[in-house]
């Protein structure tokens, strides 16, 4: 353990004791990291600690951040996108999305993404590696420091497939909940759906967290297998009917409603017959559909569904008894919206 971010109070007390310090020094480090959310990122800046203790920690390679800000982009609607550099010279992006009462942090879980969804910029360069717990948590602290307010909600909808980094994902959720004091019910984990991993998510959540109170959002984006395979290559390995069955089991195991993300693509999946087919697929269990307007990226020629088709689609789902809402896009002018995050080339 060299990065102290992500450590429990017991971990930090043990670090202090290992260096011949009183246990309360570990609690001081804990407060400095989590309660004060200090903008300073170096061990030797923890001024509540004795100078000699700080020096020994730093000399031994301990730190409180693996990331640095390479670029800031503030959209007209107040959305902030940060391009962060990692210690191994990779790049990740995270987004702060403010409203009057909330600040939502959209977090990355991997450097790049292996899923290569055709409508998404993130997977165009493939997967480099998964993020560590400290790198996930640090995104929250950078957003808070840059926007000068506390994050209230978390969505794992940035770069990467969270369920392919499941252990660090769940350990970061534990720290977000226990250390940053953000309720699990204000955390959403989005997945394009990986075989066997939805069931594994619920089982591991109970093992690591003791419960499973966060929201699972499945990027469905199609009412049938044929359409889904054309826009999500990995769908060939996971039949849509099996995804739904695994989601039903997830609801039974956790008691939590599943959300389905549905990207509206003109002429692809946006017609009334698609709404009826989706309604039939989802009928009979606790779920919710988020309709998402497509956000343009350079490499593909998909287009947004027209407003009339979107409204008709939403109305038909509602008429068919499916809970549905329309997600508003944020940060479009700075490529900070859903599907637009990528490893931007750095100068």
UniProtKB/Swiss-Prot annotation:
Active site: residue positions: 93, 338
Binding residue positions for [4Fe-4S] cluster: 113, 117, 120
Record-level GO cellular component terms: cytoplasm
Chief location category: cytoplasm
Catalytic activity of the protein: adenosine(2503) in 23S rRNA + 2 reduced [2Fe-2S]-[ferredoxin] + 2 S-adenosyl-L-methionine = 2-methyladenosine(2503) in 23S rRNA + 5'-deoxyadenosine + L-methionine + 2 oxidized [2Fe-2S]-[ferredoxin] + S-adenosyl-L-homocysteine; adenosine(37) in tRNA + 2 reduced [2Fe-2S]-[ferredoxin] + 2 S-adenosyl-L-methionine = 2-methyladenosine(37) in tRNA + 5'-deoxyadenosine + L-methionine + 2 oxidized [2Fe-2S]-[ferredoxin] + S-adenosyl-L-homocysteine
TM region positions: none
Record-listed E.C. numbers: 2.1.1.192
Residues that bind S-adenosyl-L-methionine: 160-161, 190, 219-221, 295
Cofactor(s) needed by this chain: [4Fe-4S] cluster
Radical SAM core domain mapped to chain residues: 99-333
Co-factor binding details: Binds 1 [4Fe-4S] cluster. The cluster is coordinated with 3 cysteines and an exchangeable S-adenosyl-L-methionine.
Additional notes on this entry: Reaction proceeds by a ping-pong mechanism involving intermediate methylation of a conserved cysteine residue.
PANTHER family with a match to the protein in the record: 23S RRNA METHYLTRANSFERASE (PTHR30544), RADICAL SAM CORE DOMAIN-CONTAINING PROTEIN (PTHR30544:SF5)
Name assigned to this protein: Probable dual-specificity RNA methyltransferase RlmN
Species, as recorded: Prochlorococcus marinus (strain MIT 9301)
Gene that encodes the chain: rlmN
